[in-house]
Amino acid sequence: MKSGLKIVFAGTPEFAANHLSALIESEHQVIAAYTQPDRPAGRGKKLHASAVKQLAQQHDIPVYQPASLKSEEAQQQLAALNADVMVVVAYGLILPQIILDTPKYGCLNVHGSLLPKWRGAAPIQRAIWAGDAETGVTIMQMDKGLDTGAVLSELRLAITPIDTSATLYTKLAELGPKGLLETLASLGDLTPQAQDNTLATYAEKLSKQEAKIDWTMTAAQLERNVRAFDPWPVAYFEANGAAIKVRSAEVQQTPICDNAKPGQIIQADKHAIGVQTGDGVLLIKTLQLPGKKPLATQDILNGHSDWFSVGTILS
């Protein structure tokens, strides 16, 4: 069992900061934090520090923000820290082999899926999008590939029928630190298990284009899209020249209309706006008009019933 490890942490967003927080509160010593350079954000496009940088500074942990780890200077800088292990969580920079080999126990990565499934940038969203029954976190020994390293441990989590990417993100942000601390406690005693590359799937980044609803898809797929694309980029369709975001929806289990076309509204009442899809009906429960807050269907219809009259075909 390992205790009091000297750890270099590398991460950027809030998901990573949750793991850093757990390490700070543990028996281990975080001797440095690596994170992405400050980026312009907000309407004023002022430089904004990452969640990891903000947390590290609050605890007087030295922060390093190299644009790349490929330079000899950056590599010597890391070597001088003499870390036992480097923990990487949603960092965003490629780690060259020399970096992977620098710490005594190498570099560990916490990934938000059950590897080798959903390697890549959007594992949480893709698990919902694909209709997976479960997901989890994997702690792996990093190698030069993209999420291809040998698995040290994993924790599993059921995906509920109402989980969105936002809710699943929160659950995994709690599960990940637990798995990380358990793995660190046994570091050196664990036997890394090679991933089966034949079972690998890739979690491609989401795009705004993908969020545009294609009514020829099945209702089941579109309902999953609504949950997978929440909180970003948010599934939407167009009506009356406006992009209307769908914030919640359900699948109609029994047919409402036999001859409706995909995209055609076949129900518009206080319960839902029902839209025919390529297979089944999508019952839209919550909508969001441009610049407005999400509202229940009934409230939307009170002010815009002409936009959603039965028979209208949405684009």
UniProtKB/Swiss-Prot annotation:
The keyword Transferase appears for this protein: yes
GO CC aspect terms: cytosol
GO MF annotation: an example: methionyl-tRNA formyltransferase activity
Enzyme class: transferase
Catalytic activity: L-methionyl-tRNA(fMet) + (6R)-10-formyltetrahydrofolate = N-formyl-L-methionyl-tRNA(fMet) + (6S)-5,6,7,8-tetrahydrofolate + H(+)
Residues engaged in binding (6S)-5,6,7,8-tetrahydrofolate: S113, L114, L115, P116
Keywords, sorted A to Z: Protein biosynthesis, Transferase
Gene3D superfamilies to which the protein is assigned, alphabetical: Formyl transferase, C-terminal domain (3.10.25.10), Formyl transferase, N-terminal domain (3.40.50.170)
EC number: 2.1.2.9
Pfam family membership, one: Formyl_trans_C
Record has 4Fe-4S as a keyword: no
Role according to the record: Attaches a formyl group to the free amino group of methionyl-tRNA(fMet). The formyl group appears to play a dual role in the initiator identity of N-formylmethionyl-tRNA by promoting its recognition by IF2 and preventing the misappropriation of this tRNA by the elongation apparatus.
NCBIfam families: fmt
HAMAP family the record matches: Formyl_trans
Family to which the UniProt record says this protein belongs: Belongs to the Fmt family.
Protein name as catalogued: Methionyl-tRNA formyltransferase
